[in-house]
A protein has these predicted regions:
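Hydrophobic alpha-helical transmembrane segments and adjacent short intramembrane/lumenal linkers
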Residues: 70-158
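Selected alpha-helical membrane-embedding segments in polytopic membrane proteins
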Residues: 1-84
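Juxtamembrane boundary at the C-terminal end of a transmembrane helix
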Residues: 156-175
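Detector for methionine-enriched segments
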Residues: 32, 53, 112, 123, ...
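Alpha-helix boundary/capping detector
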Residues: 29, 40, 115-116, 157-158, ...
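Detector for Asparagine
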Residues: 1, 17-19, 44, 136, ...
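Juxtamembrane "helix-exit" motif on the non-cytosolic side of transmembrane helices
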Residues: 39-46, 106-107, 162-165
Length: 175
């Protein structure tokens, strides 16, 4: 029910407190792990991917998304009605990743790119919906801004990390 409602971008999913009970954080974590595995299955149609690492990477991604959305939306730019715990934000981020489960259907190279592209935008839309609802924001634009800023920070940090591992950062050549 939570997965279907998340895929449908049902905003009432995030307003109903019974969806955020004790087990919700574990269910959100399971969605993230399955999302990571689905991504590995999709990518495995073209290149060999470490499936076990995909689950671990998904959990790390979950915490990073949750942390940035929490800090940006709750600590830096809250609305008057924004009073939410990190756990609830983290749970909502996990629920919003349910469209990623559709990546299990990317079983041929021809399907991989369109399905990954579609599900990534779908997840982004889910993050915007969930952020607006759990942070009690008045504006869709503000919700978009919080999610987009989190995305930009994550992208910058990811690119910097990869470039540092490749010794390709401009500052890595200064001696």
């Amino acid at each position: 029910n939570i997965i279907v409602r998340s895929i449908k971008l049902d905003k009432t999913l995030y307003k109903d407190n019974k969806n955020f009970g004790e087990a919700a954080i574990y269910f959100a974590g399971l969605i993230m792990i399955l999302d990571g595995l689905a991504g590995a299955v999709a990518a495995n149609t073209v290149i060999k991917t470490a499936v076990a690492m995909s689950g671990l990477t998904a959990i790390l991604t979950w915490f990073v998304w949750g942390l940035f959305i929490y800090v940006i939306g709750v600590k830096l730019f809250p609305d008057k009605e924004t009073k939410v715990s990190f756990k609830k934000v983290l749970t909502a981020v996990g629920f919003a990743h349910a469209p990623g489960l559709l990546r299990f259907f990317a079983v041929t190279p021809d399907l991989m790119i369109p399905i990954i592209f579609l599900t990534q935008f779908w997840i982004f839309a889910g993050l915007i919906v969930s952020t607006k609802q759990v942070l009690n924001l008045k504006s869709n634009i503000k919700s978009f801004g919080i999610v987009f800023l989190a995305f930009l920070i994550i992208a910058f940090l990811s690119i910097s990390f990869v470039m540092s591992k490749m010794n390709a950062l401009p500052i890595s050549n200064i001696s």
